């Protein structure tokens, strides 16, 4: 029988998965103990503050640099409206991305932005494989993807949305965001002391009183320009402060596995960490978001089809390891 197109590629991918499963099993056997469970880091799971402590929202008709568009505060806060400041910078949005479907399918582009760049409280989904996005929606729907923090509103919203969105809407949104290349979005800076922060709108922002404090074992990710971030400007990115020396340590863990601490990320995610097949790219994405995913795999909150691979890989990682890995990944070209 003649070989069908793509059969050799599929066999190669299956063989790779088998090899990785064996490697992960070996890694798990070598682990004396898993990394001890720790309290969830609030910098990665900031949630939403009590009423009255959120950042002050925009007032009246608003604009962002370089755009002729104008939106009101009510429009900017409406989950069924996507402030499209630069409509020529991306393909035409499917209806589910631009407006959603009332009453319970929010516009995808509102939270993830029209270009899929996302924000620390949700996820950058630009450039992810279509099949991967579709699978994640199925995992949300089937209870296989949750958050280790039940108060993580972005995940709660995704779970609720997944139960109402249609298969066609999921495919349309997945195809749209997959077609857009992720752009550099995060500036990573190594520091010993970091600006003091507060929680606003599900993310960290600079504290009103200023000042600094030791960074410790944290990644502090804040908007480059809070006002533009609140206006959902898809061209205004973020700064990620990481501890001194963490990028070199992260590179070692990512590229070599750190002498048995984990496995090389490049084995599954590609030599340049920009994905391979239906395995997602992990370069240049939010370190806050990536930290949550590693912890969620560790704690069993993520249980999709390839979760067994990731669980074995992240079992021994400490919070210091995770900070180093996610900081290094964020510093790489998407």
Which positions does each model-derived feature cover?
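Detector for the c-type heme attachment site
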Residues: 110-117, 141-142, 178-179, 268-274, ...
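Extended intrinsically disordered, low-complexity coil regions enriched in Ser, Thr, Gly, Ala
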Residues: 126-155, 186, 283-295, 299-307
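Flexible coil segments in periplasmic/lumen-exposed cytochrome c-class electron-transfer proteins
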Residues: 31-106, 145-264, 299-334
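Bacterial N-terminal signal peptides
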Residues: 15-25
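Bacterial Sec-dependent signal peptides at the C-terminal "C-region" and cleavage site
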Residues: 24-32
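N-terminal secretory signal peptides that target proteins for export/translocation
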Residues: 1-11
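Short cysteine/histidine-rich zinc-coordinating motifs and their immediately flanking basic loops
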Residues: 119-125, 277-283
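Intrinsically disordered, low-complexity segments enriched in Gly and acidic/Ser/Thr residues
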Residues: 257, 264, 270-279, 286-292, ...
């Amino acid at each position: 029988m003649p070989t069908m197109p793509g059969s050799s590629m599929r066999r190669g991918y299956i063989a790779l998965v088998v090899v990785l499963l064996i490697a992960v099993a070996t890694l798990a056997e070598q682990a004396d103990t898993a990394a001890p469970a720790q309290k969830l880091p609030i910098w990665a799971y900031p949630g939403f503050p009590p009423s009255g402590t959120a950042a002050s929202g925009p007032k009246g008709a608003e604009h962002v640099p370089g755009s002729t568009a104008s939106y009101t505060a009510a429009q900017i806060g409406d989950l069924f409206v996507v402030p499209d400041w630069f409509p020529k910078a991306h393909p035409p949005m499917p209806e589910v991305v631009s407006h959603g479907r009332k009453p319970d399918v929010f516009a995808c582009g509102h939270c993830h932005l029209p270009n899929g760049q996302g924000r620390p409280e949700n996820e950058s989904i630009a450039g992810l494989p279509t099949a991967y996005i579709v699978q994640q929606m199925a995992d949300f729907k089937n209870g296989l993807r949750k958050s280790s923090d039940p108060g993580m509103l972005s995940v709660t919203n995704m779970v609720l949305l997944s139960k109402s969105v249609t298969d066609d809407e999921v495919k349309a949104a997945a195809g749209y965001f997959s077609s857009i290349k992720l752009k550099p979005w995060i500036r990573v800076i190594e520091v010993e002391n970091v600006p003091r922060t507060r929680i606003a709108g599900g993310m960290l922002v600079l504290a009103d009183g200023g000042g600094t404090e030791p960074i410790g074992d944290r990644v502090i990710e804040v908007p480059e320009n809070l006002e533009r971030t609140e206006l959902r400007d898809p061209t205004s990115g973020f700064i990620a402060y990481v501890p001194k020396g963490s990028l070199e340590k992260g590179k070692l863990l990512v590229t070599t596995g750190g002498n048995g601490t984990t496995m090389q990320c490049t084995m599954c995610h590609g030599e340049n960490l920009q994905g391979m097949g239906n395995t997602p790219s992990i370069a240049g994405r939010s370190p806050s978001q990536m930290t949550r995913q590693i912890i969620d795999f560790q704690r069993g909150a993520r249980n999709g089809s390839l979760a067994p691979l990731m669980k074995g890989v992240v079992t021994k990682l400490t919070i210091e390891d995770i900070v180093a890995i996610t900081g290094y990944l964020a510093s790489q070209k998407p």
